[in-house]
Structures are given as C-alpha cells and as structure tokens.
Amino acid sequence: MKSQGQHWYSSSDKNCKVSFREKLLIIDSNLGVQDVENLKFLCIGLVPNKKLEKSSSASDVFEHLLAEDLLSEEDPFFLAELLYIIRQKKLLQHLNCTKEEVERLLPTRQRVSLFRNLLYELSEGIDSENLKDMIFLLKDSLPKTEMTSLSFLAFLEKQGKIDEDNLTCLEDLCKTVVPKLLRNIEKYKREKAIQIVTPPVDKEAESYQGEEELVSQTDVKTFLEALPQESWQNKHAGSNGNRATNGAPSLVSRGMQGASANTLNSETSTKRAAVYRMNRNHRGLCVIVNNHSFTSLKDRQGTHKDAEILSHVFQWLGFTVHIHNNVTKVEMEMVLQKQKCNPAHADGDCFVFCILTHGRFGAVYSSDEALIPIREIMSHFTALQCPRLAEKPKLFFIQACQGEEIQPSVSIEADALNPEQAPTSLQDSIPAEADFLLGLATVPGYVSFRHVEEGSWYIQSLCNHLKKLVPRMLKFLEKTMEIRGRKRTVWGAKQISATSLPTAISAQTPRPPMRRWSSVS
C-alpha cells in the first residue's frame, strides 16, 4: 500500500478518474444485497441517514462517500476498511492493497467506530432463531415489519434503547437468548476503555500516514492492559488559566487520565479529558538522568546527544533543567528525595522527568547496575508524597529497553539488558494516581535502539516533534511512535515505541525562535 497522497493503482493509467470509478463499479458488481445493507449500516454516523436510506446499491454508497470526502482516488482507505469488515477481502485487490496492509493501518486510520463494529459483529452472531426470540422479548416495542438481525439492532439504536455507553438492553437480550455474545460486549468495553483517540489528520501529518505503521492494536492492548487495574483514575482536572506568559509556550494537555483497561470508563477516556493550562512565568522543572557508564553493562555511546537536545528543548519550552550524569542507586534516591521536596514545584505548572539508561521490563538500571522499578521512581511524585505537584501534569520519558526481543521487519546499539536479572512486571510501574504520563521508548518485551553518535531514535524524534509541531502539537507522541517504524537497523530490526495513555498537546510558538539542531534528522 502506498503512502497517503499516492494512488493505490498505477499512476500511468489514462483518465485516472474514470479508471478509479471503473474499479468502484467492479467492486459494486461483486457485492450482493446483504453486502450493501452492511455497508450502509457501517456508514451510519458518517453519511447522512436520509442518503443511506435511499441507497439501493454499493455504487450509491460509494457516491455518498465521495461526496462526503470519505473516499477519493488518492485515499480510498475507508472503502478498504469497509470491505475488510464485511469480509470481502478479495476485493481489496481492486484497490491495490492487501488485508495485511489494512490491518496494519487500522489502529491509526480506523473510521468505523468500535460501537458500530460491535453491532455488526453481534448481527453476524444472531441467527434466525435467536432473532425470533429477541423480537418476541421486545414484541410490544417493535414495528410489525420483517427484520434482519442488522435492522433489528439498527432499530434499537434509532429508538435510543442502546448506544455506545448504554448496552443494558443488549446485554439482557444476549444473556437470555445467546450468552456467548456477551464476550463480544465485554471485549468492546475493554477496547473502548483503552482506545487511543486521535484527532483528524492534518496536512502536516499526512506525510506520516500510509507508511509502515509502528504499533499494532495488539501491541497497544498488551501495554495498556499491563497497567494496574486501579491506576490513574482521573480524579483531578487542573485549570490554571489560559494565558501564556514570559514568551514561553502555553501547553494544554488533554487526556492525562490513566488508561487502565478495566477501570477507565468511556466518559473519562473520551468525553471528559482533563485539561491542564500553563500560564505561570515558571513552567516547571525538567530533571534528566543521563547514564552513560556502567559497572559491567556496555557504555551508552550517544546518550549525551539525547541529554543535550532534551535540555535545550525543555529550556526553550520554559522549564528549568537539571541534568544528573551517571547516577548510582543511592544518588538516584537523593535526586528523587530532593525533587519530591523541591519548593519550586509550587510556582510551576508541570514536572518532567527523563531517564536515559539501560533497562528491563518495567524497570531501569542505575549506573552501578541496580534495577529500579519505574513505579518506585514515579511514586515519589504522587499528590500524597509531593503535594506541590497535586493536580499538575507529571511527564516521564524513559529511553531504555523494556525487553529482549527485536521487532523483525550508521552504527546502532540496543539499550541492552542484563539477562541474568529477573524481569519486573509493568503492573507495578504506574502509581494509582491521576495526572501522570509515562512515555517509554518501546513497548514491553522489546529493545530500543540508540545511534552511537546521534542519540536514540525515540528521544531525538520526540524533541524534533516538540520543535517542529509548535504551535499545532496535537499528536507528538503518536508521531514519535510512527517515525520509529520507519527507522531500521542494518539487520532489518525496527523499534516499537509506546506511550501509556492517549495524549494530545498544543502549544503557542515560543519567542525567540529556536535555532535548528543539525544533529536531528
């Protein structure tokens, strides 16, 4: 599949518009009546209902998609998504793509909602006998017309008996008639709780779309479901005004609540995202722990580049930066205790803690090779331990391995692990507290890579996007993850980046302008 902005068919075709419509006509001719109904159902909420009701063929639906800018010759991905969902995967060849390519892009480009996907899955699991029983249970409230399982569910939705946040009626029906479908509903609830909500792609972001995607939906779920069940409930929503001062950028962070798969409700995750406004003269403190040398582990060549650019960028953003090099376990505890009690937090809006070192699953190494759990580090800055940071965003960026696997797919090194050490569970990594963000250079179980001269891919990309995307810094963590998928070592390995929760950040342009860094590609 070619990147967005390029045709999925030969650009040498004459009369491209006709050629594209011919492809749509071929797809139409291979779809039956039920396929058309499925397409119409999946487009509810994206295409006006009146237009869908009048559509009698797939080509009618395609015409509406074209009119609504949901489908174009340059970007037919939404149609590919629809064909994938209704299991017409053979027809993807007419869009010059494969089901594997669609699966890879779905986590970041999915248009059909989880709720609509759920209803479609349920409709396929409700046979004629099940449907008859369900209709019998709701006989008094249903019209006297013949219904399919799909139209039955669509009617319940239209009547307001079910919606994405209210599945009680549906659960009761399934529990009575077809209990096995309750698994689908529970799966939907879990996915909705951990869903990464991304804003529409802007023009600047288009260049990132269509490239090889970095993190599959499975990777994301694995990471988020590893978090503690009670963690990061969004009990606070800090608001400190809305005016930038001192020429530094005003940062607004949304969705800083935790992403525990079992406890995060939908309103918290998608509708009531916390908003933090930063309007003080002092943005806050940025602490950088930069470990280069170790007792027996390999030196981390290039880490000074990461520390240097982190320091420069966060100073540019208005933070006071403190760098600590080659920190032992005892020294780390001293740093944590000092920062926990630092009176400067009272005058700041935010706290940033960056760790550049070797690591393992859920833990990082000190320079004397003591393994320190990430949770232990973060727990110093909860509202109870550090009241001055209560209801303020606390951002932790960690450049370190989280496992030993290399994701298959210049001089490069992994931020290596000591295989003799026992792994630490990520379930103990996150404090049960609001207002934390944890950004890891890679998902659990995988190594992260560092160029011995230019620094790590994760940190360099993070800083590059912090600079480049001001003032519309809406997806810098997601973009940091995306660009990781395009970086490869000489042996064809790629790095998987991870963040622990959905986050969007916007900022005003700092003054004076920041100079370019030649070390960042």
Swiss-Prot record:
Changing R21C: Found in a multiple myeloma sample; somatic mutation. SUPFAM superfamilies: Caspase-like (SSF52129), DEATH domain (SSF47986). Cleavage by granzyme B and autocatalytic activity generate the two active subunits. This is Caspase-10. The active site is at H358, C401. Residues 19-97, 114-187 form the DED domain. GO terms for molecular function: cysteine-type endopeptidase activity; death effector domain binding; ubiquitin protein ligase binding. It comes from Homo sapiens. InterPro entries: CASP10_DED2, Caspase-like_dom_sf, Caspase_cys_AS, Caspase_his_AS, DEATH-like_dom_sf, DED_dom, Pept_C14_caspase, Pept_C14_p10. SMART domains: CASc, DED. Transmembrane segments: none annotated. One of its GO terms (biological process) is positive regulation of canonical NF-kappaB signal transduction. The keyword Repeat applies. It is linked to Autoimmune lymphoproliferative syndrome 2A: A disorder of apoptosis that manifests in early childhood and results in the accumulation of autoreactive lymphocytes. It is characterized by non-malignant lymphadenopathy with hepatosplenomegaly, and autoimmune hemolytic anemia, thrombocytopenia and neutropenia. Familial non-Hodgkin lymphoma: Cancer that starts in cells of the lymph system, which is part of the body's immune system. NHLs can occur at any age and are often marked by enlarged lymph nodes, fever and weight loss.
